[in-house]
Protein backbone atom coordinates (compact mmCIF):
# COMPACT_ATOMS: atom_id res chain seq x y z
CA UNK A 1 0.00 0.00 0.00
CA UNK A 2 1.29 3.46 -0.91
CA UNK A 3 2.45 5.83 1.84
CA UNK A 4 0.57 9.14 1.79
CA UNK A 5 2.56 12.29 2.48
CA UNK A 6 1.81 15.97 2.94
CA UNK A 7 4.16 17.99 0.76
CA UNK A 8 2.85 21.45 1.59
CA UNK A 9 0.08 23.12 3.61
CA UNK A 10 -1.12 26.72 3.58
CA UNK A 11 -4.06 28.89 4.55
CA UNK A 12 -5.50 32.35 4.17
CA UNK A 13 -5.64 34.68 7.14
CA UNK A 14 -8.86 34.30 9.09
CA UNK A 15 -11.13 37.26 8.36
CA UNK A 16 -13.84 38.52 10.65
CA UNK A 17 -17.24 37.55 9.23
CA UNK A 18 -19.01 40.75 10.26
CA UNK A 19 -17.59 43.56 8.12
CA UNK A 20 -14.18 41.93 7.99
CA UNK A 21 -11.28 41.85 5.55
CA UNK A 22 -13.00 39.48 3.13
CA UNK A 23 -16.42 41.14 3.10
CA UNK A 24 -15.96 41.89 -0.62
CA UNK A 25 -14.09 38.67 -1.47
CA UNK A 26 -15.96 35.56 -2.55
CA UNK A 27 -15.39 32.04 -1.25
CA UNK A 28 -14.33 30.85 -4.71
CA UNK A 29 -11.64 33.54 -4.82
CA UNK A 30 -10.22 32.53 -1.43
CA UNK A 31 -10.12 28.93 -2.64
CA UNK A 32 -8.63 29.67 -6.05
CA UNK A 33 -5.96 31.86 -4.45
CA UNK A 34 -4.73 28.93 -2.37
CA UNK A 35 -4.88 26.49 -5.28
CA UNK A 36 -2.69 28.81 -7.35
CA UNK A 37 -0.36 29.43 -4.42
CA UNK A 38 0.20 25.73 -3.69
CA UNK A 39 1.04 25.02 -7.31
CA UNK A 40 3.36 28.05 -7.51
CA UNK A 41 5.20 26.94 -4.36
CA UNK A 42 5.72 23.46 -5.78
CA UNK A 43 6.61 23.94 -9.47
CA UNK A 44 8.03 20.42 -9.79
CA UNK A 45 4.44 19.18 -9.89
CA UNK A 46 2.61 20.21 -13.03
CA UNK A 47 -1.00 21.14 -12.40
CA UNK A 48 -2.12 18.71 -15.10
CA UNK A 49 -0.60 15.87 -13.07
CA UNK A 50 -3.12 16.33 -10.26
CA UNK A 51 -5.47 13.35 -10.14
CA UNK A 52 -8.24 15.17 -8.31
CA UNK A 53 -9.12 18.12 -6.11
CA UNK A 54 -11.08 17.50 -2.89
CA UNK A 55 -12.52 20.65 -1.30
CA UNK A 56 -14.56 20.86 1.90
CA UNK A 57 -17.50 23.23 2.24
CA UNK A 58 -20.61 23.00 4.43
CA UNK A 59 -23.07 25.59 3.15
CA UNK A 60 -23.07 24.57 -0.51
CA UNK A 61 -25.38 27.25 -1.83
CA UNK A 62 -25.14 30.77 -3.27
CA UNK A 63 -21.46 31.48 -4.05
CA UNK A 64 -20.49 28.20 -2.38
CA UNK A 65 -22.91 26.12 -4.40
CA UNK A 66 -22.80 24.05 -7.58
CA UNK A 67 -19.53 22.27 -6.70
CA UNK A 68 -17.36 25.11 -5.44
CA UNK A 69 -14.32 22.85 -5.80
CA UNK A 70 -14.70 22.85 -9.57
CA UNK A 71 -15.63 26.53 -9.74
CA UNK A 72 -12.54 27.50 -7.76
CA UNK A 73 -10.30 25.22 -9.84
CA UNK A 74 -11.56 26.87 -13.02
CA UNK A 75 -10.93 30.30 -11.51
CA UNK A 76 -7.41 29.19 -10.58
CA UNK A 77 -6.84 28.13 -14.21
CA UNK A 78 -6.13 24.55 -13.22
CA UNK A 79 -6.23 22.51 -16.46
CA UNK A 80 -9.75 21.46 -17.40
CA UNK A 81 -8.64 17.82 -17.39
CA UNK A 82 -8.24 17.88 -13.58
CA UNK A 83 -11.51 16.93 -11.82
CA UNK A 84 -12.73 18.41 -8.55
CA UNK A 85 -15.31 17.46 -5.95
CA UNK A 86 -16.83 19.26 -2.98
CA UNK A 87 -16.92 17.30 0.27
CA UNK A 88 -19.37 17.81 3.14
CA UNK A 89 -19.01 16.27 6.59
CA UNK A 90 -20.08 19.51 8.26
CA UNK A 91 -17.25 20.77 10.52
CA UNK A 92 -15.01 17.90 9.42
CA UNK A 93 -15.37 18.58 5.70
CA UNK A 94 -11.82 19.52 4.77
CA UNK A 95 -10.34 16.81 7.00
CA UNK A 96 -12.66 14.39 5.23
CA UNK A 97 -11.32 15.79 1.94
CA UNK A 98 -7.84 14.82 3.15
CA UNK A 99 -9.04 11.35 4.09
CA UNK A 100 -10.69 10.85 0.70
CA UNK A 101 -7.53 11.85 -1.15
CA UNK A 102 -5.36 9.72 1.13
CA UNK A 103 -7.44 6.61 0.48
CA UNK A 104 -7.25 7.15 -3.27
CA UNK A 105 -3.47 7.32 -3.03
CA UNK A 106 -3.23 4.33 -0.68
CA UNK A 107 -5.14 2.15 -3.13
CA UNK A 108 -3.07 3.28 -6.10
CA UNK A 109 -5.98 5.08 -7.78
CA UNK A 110 -4.14 8.41 -7.54
CA UNK A 111 -0.65 9.80 -7.03
CA UNK A 112 -1.27 13.48 -6.32
CA UNK A 113 -4.20 15.47 -4.99
CA UNK A 114 -4.96 18.97 -3.87
CA UNK A 115 -7.16 19.09 -0.78
CA UNK A 116 -8.60 21.81 1.38
CA UNK A 117 -11.73 23.69 2.22
CA UNK A 118 -13.43 27.03 2.58
CA UNK A 119 -16.30 28.74 4.33
CA UNK A 120 -17.37 32.35 3.98
CA UNK A 121 -19.62 32.66 7.00
CA UNK A 122 -20.11 36.35 6.35
CA UNK A 123 -21.68 35.71 2.94
CA UNK A 124 -23.38 32.37 3.64
CA UNK A 125 -24.38 32.10 7.32
CA UNK A 126 -24.29 28.74 9.06
CA UNK A 127 -28.07 28.58 9.41
CA UNK A 128 -28.88 29.70 5.86
CA UNK A 129 -31.62 27.52 4.38
CA UNK A 130 -31.37 24.83 7.08
CA UNK A 131 -34.68 22.97 7.48
CA UNK A 132 -34.50 19.89 9.72
CA UNK A 133 -37.04 17.16 9.08
CA UNK A 134 -39.68 17.33 11.85
CA UNK A 135 -39.57 13.55 12.14
CA UNK A 136 -36.07 13.74 13.60
CA UNK A 137 -37.66 14.69 16.92
CA UNK A 138 -38.78 11.07 17.35
CA UNK A 139 -35.16 9.98 17.71
CA UNK A 140 -33.15 13.09 18.50
CA UNK A 141 -33.80 16.02 20.83
CA UNK A 142 -34.41 19.28 19.00
CA UNK A 143 -31.66 20.86 21.07
CA UNK A 144 -29.19 18.42 19.49
CA UNK A 145 -29.31 20.63 16.40
CA UNK A 146 -28.36 23.68 18.46
CA UNK A 147 -24.61 23.53 18.90
CA UNK A 148 -24.45 25.88 21.87
CA UNK A 149 -26.89 23.76 23.86
CA UNK A 150 -24.87 20.60 23.15
CA UNK A 151 -21.88 22.42 24.63
CA UNK A 152 -23.96 23.34 27.69
CA UNK A 153 -24.85 19.66 28.08
CA UNK A 154 -21.20 18.60 28.02
CA UNK A 155 -20.26 21.27 30.55
CA UNK A 156 -22.88 19.98 33.00
CA UNK A 157 -22.00 16.33 32.45
CA UNK A 158 -18.27 16.91 32.98
CA UNK A 159 -18.30 19.61 35.65
CA UNK A 160 -16.77 22.29 33.42
CA UNK A 161 -17.30 25.57 35.26
CA UNK A 162 -17.78 29.03 33.80
CA UNK A 163 -14.40 29.99 35.23
CA UNK A 164 -12.66 27.09 33.46
CA UNK A 165 -14.27 28.08 30.17
CA UNK A 166 -13.29 31.74 30.51
CA UNK A 167 -9.70 30.81 31.35
CA UNK A 168 -9.42 28.51 28.34
CA UNK A 169 -10.87 31.14 25.99
CA UNK A 170 -8.47 33.80 27.25
CA UNK A 171 -5.62 31.33 26.72
CA UNK A 172 -6.69 30.78 23.12
CA UNK A 173 -6.52 34.49 22.30
CA UNK A 174 -3.25 34.96 24.19
CA UNK A 175 -1.53 32.08 22.44
CA UNK A 176 -2.84 33.03 19.00
CA UNK A 177 -1.65 36.59 19.49
CA UNK A 178 1.76 35.40 20.74
CA UNK A 179 2.04 33.17 17.66
CA UNK A 180 1.19 36.14 15.45
CA UNK A 181 3.75 38.38 17.15
CA UNK A 182 6.50 35.76 17.00
CA UNK A 183 5.90 34.96 13.33
CA UNK A 184 4.82 31.39 14.07
CA UNK A 185 2.03 31.62 11.48
CA UNK A 186 4.24 33.02 8.70
CA UNK A 187 4.96 29.63 7.17
CA UNK A 188 1.27 28.83 6.80
CA UNK A 189 -0.46 32.14 6.00
CA UNK A 190 -0.51 33.21 2.37
CA UNK A 191 -1.05 36.98 2.06
CA UNK A 192 -4.53 37.48 0.68
CA UNK A 193 -6.24 40.51 -0.79
CA UNK A 194 -9.06 42.12 1.15
CA UNK A 195 -10.33 45.50 2.33
CA UNK A 196 -9.48 47.36 5.51
CA UNK A 197 -12.01 49.22 7.65
CA UNK A 198 -11.85 52.21 5.30
CA UNK A 199 -12.49 50.08 2.24
CA UNK A 200 -8.90 50.27 0.99
CA UNK A 201 -7.71 47.19 -0.88
CA UNK A 202 -4.67 45.64 0.82
CA UNK A 203 -2.87 42.37 1.38
CA UNK A 204 -3.64 40.75 4.73
CA UNK A 205 -1.02 38.49 6.27
CA UNK A 206 -2.47 38.15 9.77
CA UNK A 207 -5.62 36.83 11.41
CA UNK A 208 -7.89 39.77 12.16
CA UNK A 209 -10.21 37.69 14.37
CA UNK A 210 -7.82 37.48 17.34
CA UNK A 211 -8.64 39.80 20.25
CA UNK A 212 -5.33 40.30 22.10
CA UNK A 213 -7.02 42.43 24.75
CA UNK A 214 -9.13 39.47 25.94
CA UNK A 215 -8.95 38.78 29.67
CA UNK A 216 -10.66 36.39 32.04
CA UNK A 217 -12.15 39.40 33.81
CA UNK A 218 -13.70 40.76 30.60
CA UNK A 219 -15.04 37.34 29.62
CA UNK A 220 -16.65 36.97 33.04
CA UNK A 221 -18.95 39.92 32.30
CA UNK A 222 -20.57 38.28 29.26
CA UNK A 223 -24.05 36.81 29.49
CA UNK A 224 -24.79 33.17 28.58
CA UNK A 225 -25.49 32.98 24.85
CA UNK A 226 -27.62 29.85 24.59
CA UNK A 227 -29.22 29.14 27.98
CA UNK A 228 -29.98 32.52 29.57
CA UNK A 229 -31.25 31.04 32.84
CA UNK A 230 -28.58 28.57 33.94
CA UNK A 231 -26.07 28.51 31.09
CA UNK A 232 -22.31 28.98 31.24
CA UNK A 233 -21.40 29.15 27.54
CA UNK A 234 -20.95 32.68 26.19
CA UNK A 235 -20.04 34.22 22.85
CA UNK A 236 -16.55 34.71 24.27
CA UNK A 237 -16.06 31.02 24.98
CA UNK A 238 -17.44 29.95 21.60
CA UNK A 239 -15.55 29.76 18.31
CA UNK A 240 -15.54 33.06 16.49
CA UNK A 241 -17.37 33.56 13.20
CA UNK A 242 -14.77 33.93 10.47
CA UNK A 243 -14.09 33.58 6.76
CA UNK A 244 -11.16 31.61 5.41
CA UNK A 245 -9.69 28.75 3.43
CA UNK A 246 -6.89 26.22 3.84
CA UNK A 247 -5.20 23.82 1.42
CA UNK A 248 -2.73 20.93 1.36
CA UNK A 249 -0.75 19.17 -1.36
CA UNK A 250 -1.06 15.41 -0.82
CA UNK A 251 0.95 12.82 -2.75
CA UNK A 252 2.23 9.28 -2.67
CA UNK A 253 5.66 9.25 -1.07
CA UNK A 254 7.14 7.61 -4.15
CA UNK A 255 5.82 10.33 -6.49
CA UNK A 256 6.95 13.13 -4.20
CA UNK A 257 10.49 11.78 -4.06
CA UNK A 258 10.47 11.11 -7.80
CA UNK A 259 9.74 14.82 -8.35
CA UNK A 260 12.30 15.92 -5.78
CA UNK A 261 9.64 17.27 -3.43
CA UNK A 262 10.39 16.92 0.28
CA UNK A 263 7.49 15.41 2.25
CA UNK A 264 6.70 17.16 5.52
CA UNK A 265 4.69 14.36 7.12
CA UNK A 266 2.97 11.05 6.49
CA UNK A 267 -0.68 10.36 7.14
CA UNK A 268 -0.23 7.63 9.74
CA UNK A 269 -3.92 6.90 10.42
CA UNK A 270 -7.43 8.28 10.00
CA UNK A 271 -10.69 7.77 11.87
CA UNK A 272 -14.30 8.92 11.80
CA UNK A 273 -16.92 7.97 14.41
CA UNK A 274 -20.49 8.78 15.36
CA UNK A 275 -21.72 9.81 18.81
CA UNK A 276 -24.91 11.03 20.50
CA UNK A 277 -25.97 14.25 18.71
CA UNK A 278 -26.87 15.78 22.08
CA UNK A 279 -23.17 15.76 22.97
CA UNK A 280 -21.80 16.20 19.46
CA UNK A 281 -18.75 17.99 20.86
CA UNK A 282 -17.51 14.77 22.45
CA UNK A 283 -16.75 13.21 19.05
CA UNK A 284 -12.98 13.89 19.21
CA UNK A 285 -12.61 11.43 22.09
CA UNK A 286 -13.71 8.21 20.33
CA UNK A 287 -12.29 9.46 17.01
CA UNK A 288 -8.87 10.12 18.52
CA UNK A 289 -8.86 6.80 20.35
CA UNK A 290 -9.70 4.95 17.14
CA UNK A 291 -7.05 6.82 15.13
CA UNK A 292 -4.45 6.07 17.81
CA UNK A 293 -5.43 2.40 17.83
CA UNK A 294 -5.08 2.21 14.05
CA UNK A 295 -1.66 3.84 14.29
CA UNK A 296 -0.53 1.50 17.06
CA UNK A 297 0.06 4.47 19.34
CA UNK A 298 -1.22 5.91 22.61
CA UNK A 299 -1.99 9.50 23.57
CA UNK A 300 1.36 9.68 25.36
CA UNK A 301 3.15 9.10 22.04
CA UNK A 302 1.67 12.26 20.52
CA UNK A 303 3.91 15.30 20.81
CA UNK A 304 1.31 17.94 19.90
CA UNK A 305 -2.45 17.98 19.43
CA UNK A 306 -4.66 20.32 17.44
CA UNK A 307 -8.23 20.03 18.71
CA UNK A 308 -10.82 22.30 17.15
CA UNK A 309 -12.20 24.70 19.72
CA UNK A 310 -15.88 24.78 18.86
CA UNK A 311 -16.55 25.78 22.47
CA UNK A 312 -14.41 25.83 25.60
CA UNK A 313 -17.20 23.81 27.24
CA UNK A 314 -16.79 21.20 24.51
CA UNK A 315 -13.02 20.88 24.17
CA UNK A 316 -12.29 20.67 27.91
CA UNK A 317 -14.29 17.42 28.41
CA UNK A 318 -12.43 15.96 25.41
CA UNK A 319 -9.06 16.95 26.85
CA UNK A 320 -10.10 15.48 30.21
CA UNK A 321 -11.23 12.13 28.84
CA UNK A 322 -8.15 11.77 26.66
CA UNK A 323 -6.09 12.11 29.84
CA UNK A 324 -4.44 15.37 28.79
CA UNK A 325 -5.61 17.91 31.38
CA UNK A 326 -2.16 18.08 32.97
CA UNK A 327 -0.50 18.59 29.58
CA UNK A 328 -2.62 21.36 28.08
CA UNK A 329 0.18 23.91 28.02
CA UNK A 330 2.72 21.42 26.67
CA UNK A 331 0.65 19.72 23.97
CA UNK A 332 -2.76 21.25 23.21
CA UNK A 333 -3.41 24.05 20.69
CA UNK A 334 -0.10 25.74 21.39
CA UNK A 335 -0.85 28.56 18.92
CA UNK A 336 -4.41 29.09 20.09
CA UNK A 337 -7.47 27.74 18.35
CA UNK A 338 -10.88 28.45 16.90
CA UNK A 339 -12.05 30.53 19.86
CA UNK A 340 -9.45 33.10 18.77
CA UNK A 341 -9.10 32.32 15.05
CA UNK A 342 -12.65 31.34 14.23
CA UNK A 343 -14.15 28.20 12.77
CA UNK A 344 -14.97 28.65 9.06
CA UNK A 345 -16.76 25.31 8.89
CA UNK A 346 -15.46 23.81 5.65
CA UNK A 347 -11.96 25.19 6.18
CA UNK A 348 -11.16 24.17 9.75
CA UNK A 349 -10.03 20.57 9.26
CA UNK A 350 -7.31 21.59 6.82
CA UNK A 351 -6.53 24.68 8.91
CA UNK A 352 -5.84 22.80 12.13
CA UNK A 353 -3.85 20.16 10.22
CA UNK A 354 -1.73 22.89 8.63
CA UNK A 355 -1.07 24.53 11.99
CA UNK A 356 -0.28 21.11 13.46
CA UNK A 357 2.38 20.36 10.83
CA UNK A 358 4.15 23.62 11.58
CA UNK A 359 4.02 22.97 15.32
CA UNK A 360 5.40 19.45 14.84
CA UNK A 361 8.35 20.89 12.97
CA UNK A 362 8.88 23.74 15.44
CA UNK A 363 8.71 21.42 18.46
CA UNK A 364 10.66 18.67 16.65
CA UNK A 365 8.18 15.93 17.54
CA UNK A 366 7.52 12.74 15.60
CA UNK A 367 3.75 12.40 15.95
CA UNK A 368 0.87 14.87 15.92
CA UNK A 369 -2.90 14.42 16.06
CA UNK A 370 -5.59 16.71 14.65
CA UNK A 371 -9.20 16.15 15.66
CA UNK A 372 -12.54 17.90 15.67
CA UNK A 373 -16.15 17.51 16.68
CA UNK A 374 -18.87 17.56 14.05
CA UNK A 375 -22.42 18.85 14.32
CA UNK A 376 -25.17 16.22 14.76
CA UNK A 377 -22.78 13.87 16.52
CA UNK A 378 -19.58 12.81 14.77
CA UNK A 379 -15.86 13.06 15.36
CA UNK A 380 -12.90 12.93 12.99
CA UNK A 381 -9.18 12.54 13.65
CA UNK A 382 -5.90 12.19 11.77
CA UNK A 383 -2.51 11.09 13.07
CA UNK A 384 0.50 12.58 11.27
CA UNK A 385 4.09 11.37 11.42
CA UNK A 386 7.00 13.55 10.44
CA UNK A 387 9.14 12.20 7.64
UniProtKB/Swiss-Prot annotation:
SUPFAM superfamilies: Thiolase-like (SSF53901). The active site is at residues 91, 343, 373. GO terms for molecular function: acetyl-CoA C-acyltransferase activity. Pfam families: Thiolase_C, Thiolase_N. The keyword Cytoplasm applies. It is found in: Cytoplasm. GO terms for cellular component: cytoplasm. Its EC number is 2.3.1.16. This is 3-ketoacyl-CoA thiolase. It comes from Shigella sonnei (strain Ss046). The gene is fadA.
Amino acid sequence: MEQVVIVDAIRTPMGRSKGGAFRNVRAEDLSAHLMRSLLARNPALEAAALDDIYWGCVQQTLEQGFNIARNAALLAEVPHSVPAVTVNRLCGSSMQALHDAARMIMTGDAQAGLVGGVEHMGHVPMSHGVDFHPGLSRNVAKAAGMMGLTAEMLARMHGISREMQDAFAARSHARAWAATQSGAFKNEIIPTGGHDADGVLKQFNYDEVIRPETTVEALATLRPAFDPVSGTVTAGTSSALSDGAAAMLVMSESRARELGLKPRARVRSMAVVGCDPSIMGYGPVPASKLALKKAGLSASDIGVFEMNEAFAAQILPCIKDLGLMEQIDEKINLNGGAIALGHPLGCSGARISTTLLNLMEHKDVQFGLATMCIGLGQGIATVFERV
